[in-house]
Amino acid sequence: MQTDDFDFKLPDELIAQRPPERRGDSRMMVIHRDTGVIEHRQFSELHEYVEADDLWVFNDTRVEPARFFSNDERMEILKLDAASPTVWKCLVKPGKRLKVGRTIEIGKSTGTVIDVLEPGGERMIEFDVAPDPESQGHLALPPYISREDEESDRDRYQTVYARENGAIAAPTAGLHFDDELMASLPHDFVTLHVGVGTFRPVSADKLEEHHMHSERYELSAETAQKIDDAKRVVAVGTTVVRVLESCVDSESGSLKSGKGETEIFIYPPYQLKAVDALLTNFHLPKSTLLMLVSAFSSRELMLKAYEQAVDSRYRFFSYGDCMLIL
């Protein structure tokens, strides 16, 4: 398949720049895969689609304020990972001239480049004292949000159930849920730390030539058993799908617990094995996430749904509306 097969026209004004006033004040498109019927509902009506034997699976990763600025404000440093508390893998902008031995000052911390991982800007940096994300860091809002992060984003660009530090981006399907709704749903958690690769476009013309970014995940034995035993598994977000499909045993069909890194790339005609329903936001044209949801339904049905979403002026992307695929 071609990357261009997943393109659609999206007016800029439909890209949500801010969250709704309250969590859950969103529209919800409901897609029935068996009939092709598309409904236009409100997220507040989600309870109508919850079944007694469901298990709703959420990603409990927590977004870390991982974006820093040098004291001279000439460089932006995005923490991608940590080899130790003081040795970070970073994306530095501009970073092409940042060679081994160069130093960066962030507050009272001094970082020294100890390795060049990628000429464009990925560096290993060793700090004398690590900068503090909570007091010095900024949230790395997605590039399609055309404003700087604000204090309110620390609450709204975070799920209410986030607990495992390590994500650069939020698992945005979960942003619609408040504590009251969570308490009413039979649920459990997996962890996938969403990385900066989630924003990178597909550069290859053919899907099979695209190399997926790697992300760290964890699935406990207890949760794996609950999912195997569930009558219907509802994944809240594409990140949950990536964890579960990465952990399916090819022979038994059951889930293997554990932790590791996944580079799974899901696109048609891949058949999902561990998920029965999916709640997700609306995704970018030609993105790997649009390809994933197309594998779960079909490319034709998904593009039809997106065309209706544009015509009906749904709000798109991280702070936007959602879609329930049954």
Descriptions of predicted regions:
Residues 1-326:
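Surface-exposed, charge/polar-rich loops and edge strands
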